[in-house]
Swiss-Prot record:
It comes from Picosynechococcus sp. (strain ATCC 27264 / PCC 7002 / PR-6) (Agmenellum quadruplicatum). This is Cytochrome c biogenesis protein CcsA. One of its GO terms (cellular component) is plasma membrane-derived thylakoid membrane. Pfam families: Cytochrom_C_asm. GO terms for molecular function: heme binding. It is a multi-pass membrane protein. Coiled coil: none annotated.
C-alpha cells in the first residue's frame, strides 16, 4: 500500500467532508424545520475524525515515529482533537449550535494544512536528535489535546455571547448578587416585545455598619432590552455549562503538558524553563484559563463575564500554537513558512 498516496487522499477527504459538514450545520440552524440536517452533520464530523485518525496512523507507519514532528502533522492532530471534543460537546448538549461554530474552525485547520502548506512541509522527515524521545508523545500529544479542548470550550463561550447578544442573563444555579439578570418576558407578549430591565445598584451599608439596604434605582439606568425566548435562555444555559466543562477538561491537560515539557527540556537541554517564546505563551495561556476557572469556581461568575474571558483565551491559544511558527523563532518553531 502506498502510504504517501493514502495520506494525500485522506487529508483532502477530511477537508471536503468538514466543508460539507459545515454547510449541513449552517443549513440546520437556518432551516430548523428540515429534519436530519444536524444528524448528517454529526455523521460528517465522525467520518472526518476517522479519516484524520487514519491519516495520522498511516504517517506513523510511514515515518516510524509519533506524527507530531512538523506543522502539517500537528495541524491534523489538532483538527482531530477539535472534532473529538466537538463530538463530546454535542453529545453532552444535544445542540446544533455546537457544530455551527466548531465545524468551520475544524474545516479551516484542515484547509490550511492540506491546501496552503508547501509540499516540503507536508512530507515526513527524519527526527532531529532532541525529538528522538518518548517525551515527544507524552508532552506534545497532551498539549495538542489541551489546545483542542480549550478552543472548543472557548468557541462555545463565543456562541453563548452570540445567542445572548452580549446581554446579562441569570443562569440556572447562579448565586444572588453575581451581577446577572434573567431577562424575563411579561405574560401575553411575543418574543419581540421589549421589556424594561431595572439595573439596581449594589447594596450599600448603612452608617451604623450593621444593616445593608438596596439603594434606589437610578432612572437613568433604566434600559429597554429585547427579551430572549425560553428556548434561547435554555440554549444559553447549556452553552455556558458545556463550555465550562470542556475548558475544565482542557486546563488540567494543559498543566500536565507544561510540566511534562519542563521535564523534557531539562533532560534535553539542562534547563526546566528558558523563556522560549512557546514557553512564555503557554504560561500566558495557562494564566488566562486559570483566571477563568478561578472566576467561575471561587467568585461564582457565570454567563457574560467568564464568556468574554474565554473568548479572549481563544485568541491566546492560537498565538501560543501558531504565533511562534509565524515568527520562526525559538526551539519550538517549525520554521518560517511564508
Amino acid at each position: 500500500m502506498d502510504l504517501v498516496a493514502l495520506q494525500s487522499l485522506l487529508d483532502n477527504t477530511s477537508f471536503l467532508v468538514l466543508f460539507l459538514t459545515m454547510l449541513l450545520y449552517w443549513g440546520g440552524a437556518a432551516f430548523p424545520n428540515i429534519p436530519g440536517l444536524t444528524g448528517l452533520g454529526t455523521l460528517g464530523v465522525a467520518i472526518a475524525n476517522l479519516c484524520m485518525a487514519t491519516l495520522l496512523g498511516a504517517r506513523w507507519l510511514e515515518a516510524g515515529y509519533f506524527p507530531l514532528s512538523n506543522l502539517y502533522e500537528s495541524l491534523f492532530f489538532l483538527a482531530w482533537g477539535v472534532t473529538t471534543m466537538h463530538l463530546v460537546a454535542e453529545w453532552m448538549s444535544r445542540s446544533r449550535w455546537v457544530g455551527v461554530i466548531t465545524a468551520p474552525v475544524a474545516m479551516g485547520i484542515t484547509a490550511f494544512a492540506a491546501l496552503s502548506l508547501p509540499a516540503e512541509m507536508q512530507n515526513s522527515a527524519p527526527l532531529v536528535p532532541a525529538l528522538k524521545s518518548n517525551w515527544l508523545m507524552m508532552h506534545v500529544s497532551v498539549m495538542m489535546i489541551s489546545y483542542a479542548a480549550l478552543l472548543v470550550g472557548s468557541l462555545l463561550a463565543i456562541a453563548f455571547l452570540i445567542v445572548t447578544k452580549g446581554q446579562k442573563i441569570e443562569l440556572r444555579g447562579s448565586s444572588v448578587g453575581n451581577g446577572s439578570y434573567r431577562l424575563r418576558q411579561p405574560q401575553n407578549t411575543t418574543d419581540e416585545t421589549p421589556v424594561t430591565v431595572v439595573a439596581f445598584q449594589k447594596t450599600e451599608p448603612q452608617s451604623n455598619g450593621n444593616t445593608a439596604v438596596l439603594a434606589s434605582p437610578d432612572l437613568q439606568q433604566l434600559t429597554t432590552t429585547p427579551a430572549l425566548s425560553p428556548q434561547m435562555l435554555s440554549l444559553a444555559d447549556t452553552l455556558d455549562n458545556i463550555s465550562y466543562r470542556i475548558i475544565g477538561l482542557g486546563f488540567p491537560l494543559l498543566t500536565i503538558g507544561i510540566i511534562a515539557g519542563a521535564v523534557w527540556a531539562n533532560e534535553a537541554w539542562g534547563s526546566y524553563w528558558s523563556w522560549d517564546p512557546k514557553e512564555t505563551w503557554a504560561l500566558i495561556t495557562w494564566l488566562v484559563f486559570a483566571a477563568y476557572l478561578h472566576a467561575r469556581i471561587t467568585r461564582g461568575w457565570q454567563g457574560r463575564q467568564p464568556a468574554f474571558l474565554a473568548a479572549a483565551g481563544f485568541f491566546v491559544v492560537w498565538v501560543c500554537y501558531l504565533g511562534v511558527n509565524i515568527l520562526g523563532k525559538g526551539l519550538h518553531s517549525y520554521g518560517w513558512f511564508f
